[in-house]
Amino acid sequence: MSEPRTLLVIAGEFPPLKTIGRIRTVKFVDQLRQHGWRSIVITLKPSGTEPNYDPSLMAEIVDGVEVVRVPIRNREDEIANAVKRLLGRKPAAPSVSAATVSGAAVAVAAPVATAPSGGLMDHAHAMTRWVLRSFVDVPDDFRLWADEALKVARKLCAERRIDAVYTTLPPFSSMFVGHALRRETGLPWIADYRDLWYGDVL
């Protein structure tokens, strides 16, 4: 009997986060298993405090699926805390807000958005957020997570037999992982567009 082939899955939405996007990936890797493929899933590492965190959803992951969880970084928090340290202030703990992915809320660590009150710091914060979201965190807020996920994926490709790469979008930053692996390894890359890249899906 031949050895099962291995699919490396890059999925921002996966149990135990309760999102619509998780269902497709869970069912997909289950169906592949029945056709002789095993899957390694690289996904977000939840903190357990997210409003859509549901540990009971772990039961959806079928036996034999290997899950590697990568923490999500928040660029706004990192910049804000760096400035506070320079000013001698105590860095704030990240708050939890929801980033919209494929019509569902994916809870991530993020600063609470508030309207500038007119102070210098408020205006600086608002400007920083605008610059990041307009020119840096493109195509979405998961760009830093994708960079970390790529490091993990490269290590897996170097140490394990990987036969193909599958990225499911959104978050659209997952695409960068698939594109880089395709370029560096020559592995087949499947990009699953669940939603529009741009515009309101509704």
Q: Residue ranges of each PLM-predicted region?
A:
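A conserved catalytic-core segment of Leloir-type glycosyltransferases
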Residues: 44-147, 156
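A generic secondary-structure signal
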Residues: 31, 152-156, 181
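Helix C-cap/helix->beta junction micro-motif
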Residues: 35, 160, 181-187
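Terminal low-complexity segments of carbohydrate-biosynthetic enzymes
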Residues: 3, 9, 136, 150-160
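Short N-terminal targeting/anchoring amphipathic segment
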Residues: 95-103, 110, 153-174, 187-190
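An aromatic- and histidine-rich active-site surface loop
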Residues: 135-150, 165-185, 191-194, 199
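Short acidic, glycine/proline-rich loop/turn micro-motifs
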Residues: 160, 200-202
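N-terminal subdomain of nucleotide-sugar transferases
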Residues: 1-79
